[in-house]
């Protein structure tokens, strides 16, 4: 139980996939203008990350490794992620048509979000991870992505009404804000030993 808690805290704060490992930066910068959109995408991404971590672990452990087909890992994981994203898209469309319209093109683009493939590949490289650890890592990565995306969206909403000097408006202030958030998350680096 302690190991799972450490994996969760590590994925959310210490080794945050967005601010520490720089994965998932496209949706981080692109969908963070409004907090409602950020919440919707973060929930969908967390769901996809968790399911993709589960499915890719099963694929790696019970198909690719026993059959000595590990060289097909990336292609297999991309196919698994595509199926999980399609399932998520259908689920969101049925349960929340408004959220489906708000997310628009960003929902199918979760397939190409590098954080999803990155988590699957990192889990596959950790041979000591069992099913629960891989799932916890995926869920923690999703929670970390959600935390950072919602915080960044809230900051961008505040910055949008602030008096920002002309040269810093738009992407420039966004990058500065992301850098400051990354520095803040560096403070968690001593929380969990490697």
Swiss-Prot record:
GO terms for cellular component: plasma membrane. Its EC number is 7.-.-.-. It is an enzyme of class 7 (translocase). The complex is composed of six subunits: RnfA, RnfB, RnfC, RnfD, RnfE and RnfG. This is Ion-translocating oxidoreductase complex subunit A. The chain crosses the membrane at residues 4-24, 39-59, 72-92, 102-122, 135-155, 172-192. It is found in: Cell inner membrane. It comes from Pseudomonas aeruginosa (strain ATCC 15692 / DSM 22644 / CIP 104116 / JCM 14847 / LMG 12228 / 1C / PRS 101 / PAO1). InterPro entries: Ion_transpt_RnfA/RsxA, NqrDE/RnfAE, NqrDE/RnfAE_oxidrdctase.
